[in-house]
């Protein structure tokens, strides 16, 4: 299984997690879900359309500012549970040690981390870095913008397919507290048990605000795979609104309120109590069509 994750290699030492060595991190994040310094990432906002920046601020910032914040988070050490190296029996202790509502972005003597942490991540035994041609994608994007040709969802989809930058993620926004920690624990267990591939959660920002959990899939064009991941997230106990964003938008710095008036998220999922056996209703946002 080729994992679609923003995860760093080498985690799992020392009891299943810890701050990652920079050289290990740069070697492992070579694929499309790996929100790297080459890619633009995380736009915070009140609308549930984008990833929240690990910096935690929510409105009034340009895409360039948000990309810079996200890049800084990506360069800082991560806390990672790597099921390829660490027994699953150690997961509960790791989760108890690093609850995302308590891990702070820049470190604090009273928090589990005294040094900055960019992300907290978990990935399963099938994690295989596979980035696609991100540099080629970004070069083609620059050429498209200078050509004056229209920028449309179809254009971006074709760029992603051409350069094999196909990963995407379900986004879950929650305020710091029990619900966030509970949701993250359920998702991390699903990753380690093989029901999901890779996931990460932002640490708590100094300013407060919502944190974001990102759950990755290999291929945003594989609708069945995207829906299966949604079902696994619901089975893990998550009941809030989810939105799904292809990583091609992330790498190209396309956020909500962008100059092309594009919606960066393809799908939204709403929990359905006592309704569908799968536990949610998923909407294709571009076409306003229910998929489940």
Swiss-Prot record:
Residues 1-10 have a biased composition (Low complexity). Disulfide bonds: none annotated. It comes from Bos taurus (Bovine). SUPFAM superfamilies: eIF4e-like (SSF55418). Belongs to the UPF0696 family. Gene3D superfamilies: RNA Cap, Translation Initiation Factor Eif4e (3.30.760.10). This is UPF0696 protein C11orf68 homolog. InterPro entries: Bles03 (IPR015034), TIF_eIF4e-like (IPR023398). Residues 35-44 have a biased composition (Basic and acidic residues). Residues 1-60 are annotated as: Disordered. It comes from the Eukaryota. Pfam families: Bles03.
């Amino acid at each position: 299984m080729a994992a679609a994750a923003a995860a760093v290699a080498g985690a799992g030492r020392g009891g299943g997690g810890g701050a990652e060595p920079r050289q290990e991190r740069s070697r492992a994040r070579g694929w499309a879900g790996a929100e790297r310094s080459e890619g633009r990432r995380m736009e915070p906002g009140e609308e549930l359309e984008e990833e929240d920046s690990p910096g935690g601020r929510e409105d009034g910032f340009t895409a360039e500012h948000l990309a810079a914040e996200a890049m800084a988070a990506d360069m800082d050490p991560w806390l990672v549970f790597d099921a390829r190296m660490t027994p699953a029996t150690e997961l509960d202790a790791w989760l108890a040690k690093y609850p995302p509502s308590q891990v702070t972005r820049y470190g604090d003597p009273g928090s589990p981390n005294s040094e900055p942490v960019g992300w907290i991540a978990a990935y399963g035994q099938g994690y295989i870095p596979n980035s696609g041609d991100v540099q080629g994608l970004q070069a083609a994007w620059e050429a498209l913008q200078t050509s004056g040709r229209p920028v449309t969802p179809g254009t971006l989809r074709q760029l992603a397919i051409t350069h094999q930058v196909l990963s995407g993620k379900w986004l879950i926004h929650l305020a710091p507290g029990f619900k966030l920690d509970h949701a993250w624990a359920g998702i991390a267990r699903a990753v380690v048990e093989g029901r999901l591939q890779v996931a990460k959660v932002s640490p708590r920002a100094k300013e407060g605000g919502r944190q974001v959990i990102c759950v990755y899939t290999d291929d945003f064009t594989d609708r069945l795979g995207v829906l299966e991941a949604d079902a696994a997230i619901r089975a893990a106990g998550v009941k809030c609104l989810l939105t799904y964003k292809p990583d091609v938008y992330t790498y190209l710095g396309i956020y909500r309120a962008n100059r092309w008036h594009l919606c960066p998220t393809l799908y939204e999922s709403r929990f359905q109590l006592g309704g569908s056996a799968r536990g949610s209703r998923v909407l294709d946002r571009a076409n306003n069509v229910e998929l489940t």
